[in-house]
Amino acid sequence: MSAKIIRIATRQSPLALWQANHVREMLVKQWPNLSIELLPMITSGDRFLKDKLLSAGGKGLFVKELEEALLDKRADLAVHSTKDMPAQLPDGLSLAAICKRDNPFDALISPRFKSLDALPKNAIIGTSSLRRQSQLLAYNPNLQIKTLRGNIHTRLSKLESGEYQAIILAAAGLERMGLAHHITQLIPDDIMLPTCAQGALCIECRTDDLEIQELIHGLNDPISALCVHTERRVNAKLGGNCHIPFAVYCTITAEKLLLLRAKVLNLDGSQMIDDEQQGKIEEAEIIADRCTESLMTKGAMSLLSTIPS
């Protein structure tokens, strides 16, 4: 690798900076003489945090400015939470590495109640995710869902102020920030299936930048990448945005088989369509397509058409 400085585009939130520094540390461990700088940026998603992402434009708002920095060569690579990535990337950009996946599950945080089952009737639960909202209401229709936005510390502060009885956050973000002690319950995946790629960091770069791709190749975790790309394939075929209550989770079983589960719900959780597929690892794309076709046959697109755009 040449002596040039490598620039990593990242959001400015504390979690995003932690993630970018984590990738920098892994790169320097592999390439000790590498010079790396962070290029922190405020994205459209950060500016819209107080608004509904549904009306503002969805999850792609958290990566748009970072991708522009890649395309105009102000940055050499960008670090993202893969769950924030749109199903379709801009021409000229690729996901060159999926880092080893951290905790993919959702966490209940409550100062008073130790589990979902302990929450009282009409308890106010904070989340901005339609996926979490619909699955919470499917499990307990007596809960009250209230929008919760901001970075991790802001959300925890709102909980502590008494605005909510409990909030739901991604466990991985809390663990990365040293805030795992706030977790009251890891929500079982039979109650709340994760979103596409939750818990996985990805590294995006220019498709034609073979030097950078070689640099970050060692950070790619093959199993995590297989599972994430399988989830993203289903997500893309079902519309590929955060406007829909859709969950998908892929794992490798003890028997070395690929297990893929997905579900689509309406907003109040009263209707749900789910599917489970299993097969050989080398048939991941076939399994993803089979899962998608099964969901569609069961009426997933009709159910999704009831979700306001």
From Swiss-Prot:
* E.C. numbers: 2.5.1.61
* UniProt-listed Pfam families: Porphobil_deam, Porphobil_deamC
Q: Which residues form the signal peptide?
A: none
What family is reported?
Belongs to the HMBS family.
Task: Tell me how the cofactor is bound.
Answer: Binds 1 dipyrromethane group covalently.
Question: What GO molecular functions are on record for this protein?
Answer: hydroxymethylbilane synthase activity
Instruction: Indicate the quaternary assembly.
Output: Monomer.
Report the GO terms under cellular component.
cytoplasm
Q: Does the keyword Transferase apply?
A: yes
| Swiss-Prot/TrEMBL catalytic activity | 4 porphobilinogen + H2O = hydroxymethylbilane + 4 NH4(+)
- List residues, modification S-(dipyrrolylmethanemethyl)cysteine: C242
Instruction: Name the cofactor(s).
Output: dipyrromethane
What SUPFAM superfamilies does this protein map onto?
A: Periplasmic binding protein-like II (SSF53850), Porphobilinogen deaminase (hydroxymethylbilane synthase), C-terminal domain (SSF54782)
Q: Which HAMAP family match?
A: Porphobil_deam (MF_00260)
Q: Which InterPro entries match?
A: HemC (IPR000860), Porphobilin_deaminase_cofac_BS (IPR022419), Porphobilin_deaminase_N (IPR022417), Porphobilinogen_deaminase_C (IPR022418), Porphobilinogen_deaminase_C_sf (IPR036803)
Protein name, as recorded: Porphobilinogen deaminase
Which keywords appear in this protein's UniProt record, sorted alphabetically? Porphyrin biosynthesis, Transferase
The extra comment attached to this record reads: The porphobilinogen subunits are added to the dipyrromethane group.
Describe the function of this protein.
Tetrapolymerization of the monopyrrole PBG into the hydroxymethylbilane pre-uroporphyrinogen in several discrete steps.
Q: Name one GO biological process term.
A: protoporphyrinogen IX biosynthetic process
